[in-house]
Amino acid sequence: MTKSLLQLIILIFFFNYSLFSQSERKFKIHTVAFYNVENLFDTINDPNKQDEKSPMMDITYNRGGVYKQKIKNMARVIADIGEDVTKKNPAIVGLSEVENKQVIIDLIKDSSLSGTDYEIIHYESPDKRGIDVAMIYNKESFKPISTKSYELLIYDDQTNKRIYTRDQLLVSGTLEDDLIHVIVNHWPSRSGGEARSISKRESAARLNKKIIDSLHSLDKNARIITMGDFNDNPMNNSIKGILGAKKNKEDVKIKEMYNPMEKILTNEGIGSNSYRDVWFLFDQVIISKGLLGNDFSSYKFYKAGVFNKPYLTQKEGRYKGQPFRSFSYSKFTNGYSDHYPSFIYLIKEMK
């Protein structure tokens, strides 16, 4: 073999090795999700709350058994979100429609979730229905630094009386050394009609924007996730106008927000909840510019989705084709929730 031929073979080997090495970049991946768990109430009548109006209180037979099954069903869903990709439970999950901390304790103790070392962040809110937002996190992946609950002060347009609703929960912490801020929301409902209730959600949006702006004032590249049941679509003024959430990543500037859920609704026709056979995407995960880009030395946004596996969809009856709700006509259906969860993946290159 000639010297020049040997050099050529060596060159080809190292060239191919280089290409193979680049194509084999490896990434860490985590799921961050939000789930409206539809009236996750305990079986005890709390005199300080209007929980007697909850579907759980309408159950007159085997209420304890219904509660245990409801917990098991919710835990199954949470465990499944993103599992086909990450092969593990979500790192962070925002929750809405939980009555108190105890129901969340019962939730994370279920066998579907007990293998993950989840901790809870929860504040009691002044909501008249007695429902709160909360967050669970895998403490092996996420380490909270600070938490705060922001009270939303809104008033009825006609009576000027205060409307007691859910707080907005801010959790700041590190996802494997990367500082991340998570806001969990459940904005005022469309009770009384969209037009009459719109001002309440726009007030919620202004509070949310204030929180986001305060984080951006400390760091223009802050990694922020605001997620929840906003009771508005991505195109509504509360999200599009007040929060300024953009549909396209390339349009997002410093200190602005990107809403990956908008394309899911408008381009793919996928929603998270349905009313009178019309799909809405009220359950959204919205992120800041700081989580965008191709520098994966820190955690960045990879993909978003609505978790709508077939078992979560009603197969028959009045609500056929809609999310398989837990309660209907004061009875437990052995379903899950009237909302699908929404989620994102965050990825970081392994060194």
Residue ranges and their predicted role:
Residues 56-67, 89-95, 122-123, 157-159, ...:
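Second-shell loop/turn segments in exported
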Residues 42, 102-105, 129-132, 191-194, ...:
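Extracytoplasmic/secreted cell-surface and envelope-processing proteins
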Residues 22, 214-224, 232-351:
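Metal-dependent phosphoester-hydrolase catalytic domains
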Residues 19-113, 117, 121-133, 309-321, ...:
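N-terminal, active-site-proximal structural segment of metallo-dependent hydrolase catalytic domains
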Residues 1-27:
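Bacterial Sec-dependent N-terminal signal peptides
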Residues 31-34, 91-96, 119-122, 134-137, ...:
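Structural recognition of the beta-strand scaffold that forms the well-ordered cores
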Residues 122, 169, 173-264:
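Extracytoplasmic, non-cytosolic globular domains
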